[in-house]
A protein has these predicted regions:
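Alpha-solenoid repeat scaffolds
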Residues: 17-18, 34-39, 87, 91
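Alpha-solenoid helical repeat scaffolds
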Residues: 6, 22-26, 95-98
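N-proximal helix/coil linker or "cap" segments that precede and/or mark the start of modular domains
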Residues: 60-146
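Amphipathic alpha-helical repeat scaffolds of TPR domains
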Residues: 1, 21-41, 48-60, 109-110
C-alpha cells in the first residue's frame, strides 16, 4: 500500500541503524518485485478475474498496478536488492517474535537469491548450464540444446 511504502521510505532515511535501514530496503525491494509481478499479471487477466483481485485488494490498488510500468518497478527492485547485498549483507535478518527467534539468515542471504533469480532465471534470460545424466544413462548438457525448445522435468523421491 502507499502508506506502507511511505513508512519504509521514512525508515530508510531515519538513521535508526543499519539493521532497521537494511530491513526496510529489503522490504521495499520485495514490495517492488511483487508489484512488478502483479502489474504484469493484471494486464493479462480477464475482467472477471480482475474483479476478484479488486475485491481482495481494492480497486485503487489494482488500477495503480495496471497503470504502472512493470519494467521500471523490476529495475527498482533489482537496484534495492543490490543495495542490500552491497551495504547490508552482514546484517542479521532473523525475526524475533514473542521471544522466539525465527532464523532467516543475514539480509544479504535473503536478498541474494532474489537478485540471482531476477538476473538469471527470468523469462528471456539464458538458462544456467545444467550437466547431468538422462534416464538412459547418457551424459548431457543443457547447452547442447541451445536454440531448441526444451522442457526440463525435475523430480525425485525423498
Amino acid at each position: 500500500s502507499p502508506s506502507m511504502e511511505k513508512l519504509l521510505g521514512i525508515l530508510i532515511k531515519a538513521e535508526l541503524g543499519r539493521g532497521v535501514e537494511g530491513a526496510a530496503v529489503l522490504a521495499l525491494a520485495k514490495t517492488r518485485k511483487g508489484q512488478a509481478d502483479r502489474a504484469n499479471q493484471f494486464k493479462q487477466l480477464t475482467p472477471e478475474r480482475l474483479e476478484l483481485y479488486e475485491n481482495a485488494y481494492g480497486a485503487d490498488y489494482v488500477a495503480r498496478l495496471q497503470a504502472a510500468d512493470a519494467t521500471t518497478l523490476l529495475a527498482e527492485a533489482e537496484q534495492l536488492f543490490q543495495r542490500v547485498v552491497d551495504e547490508f549483507a552482514d546484517v542479521n535478518g532473523d525475526l524475533v517474535l514473542n521471544g522466539r527467534t525465527l532464523p532467516r539468515g543475514t539480509l544479504g542471504e535473503q536478498a541474494a537469491p532474489a537478485l540471482f533469480e531476477m538476473n538469471n532465471l527470468s523469462v528471456g534470460k539464458v538458462a544456467p548450464e545444467i550437466a547431468a545424466e538422462d534416464i538412459g544413462g547418457v551424459d548431457f548438457k543443457l547447452s547442447d540444446y541451445r536454440g531448441k525448445v526444451v522442457m526440463l522435468d525435475f523430480w525425485g523421491h525423498w
